[in-house]
Amino acid sequence: MAEAGFSVTVPATTANLGPGFDHLGLALSLKMKIEATPALAWFIQYHDKEYASLPTDETNLIVQTIQQTAARYDQAVAPQKLVVYSDIPLGKGLGSSATAIAAGIEIANELADLQLSKLDKLCIGSEMEGHADNVTAALLGGMTVSYFTEEEMEVLTFPAPPIGVVIMVPPVALKTETSRGLLPEYLTHKEAIRGSAAGSLMTAAIANSDWVTAGRMMERDIYHEPYRKIGFPNFDEIRSACREVGAYGMTISGAGPSLFIAVPPETEQQVAALLDQRFPHYQAIAMQPAENGACVTK
């Protein structure tokens, strides 16, 4: 079992990309780094003011994940001091909870010497998160496509796509469970077919590096965007502006409240500056997809 300190780095993620609802995830270049050292009691120290409202004791999601992961294998872990550095906006649709869960799994694996397989980590994370899209991308990096039920887990990975990314962050946070409450319980068979076709074509286009087609399909979602977009100021106006500046497509990042914009490579800074100027109540952040998922450094 680990005695000396170590660190874990986990990327931010976006999920869905429109019609890839609850099964498509993309790792992003924003990161959370956690330094773990032995301590007399669990204590989490956040270096970013945005995280100041989170628990700093055993009720913290990272610690709960560590303890629950170890307990699955009848192991207990010694208390740690966890120093957290993160540039991932909290509660803004960039997978902050999935990042915490992925980090907790990696820390438990290290502290208790669990020797978890990749599939073990993916199953644990997806069960804890309740869906697989964000946590698979956080653990594996690149782009992930997942099939997850109580009985089965399948994940395929793609390399990080050669695009730029702009995330439009509003001033308010949104809990995923609140956003999920906006969704209908049922879709008609005809609607489901249309949504499935858009998601399949988008994924195939991404695999073929055809981001023009992928961007169009990204905006054809019927599973969640029509119901969630009402909570976004200037949603349609922002989408029109994205088209004007040459973006491939725009959609909701995960469950929101941020927006995900795919743009041609090396244009993300320019597009972010233009959107920042036009929509000052949002914060436009330029970034790229991330190739690497969670990693441990000793």
Where do the protein language model's features map onto the residues?
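Short beta-strand segments
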Residues: T9-P11, A27, A138-G141, Y147, ...
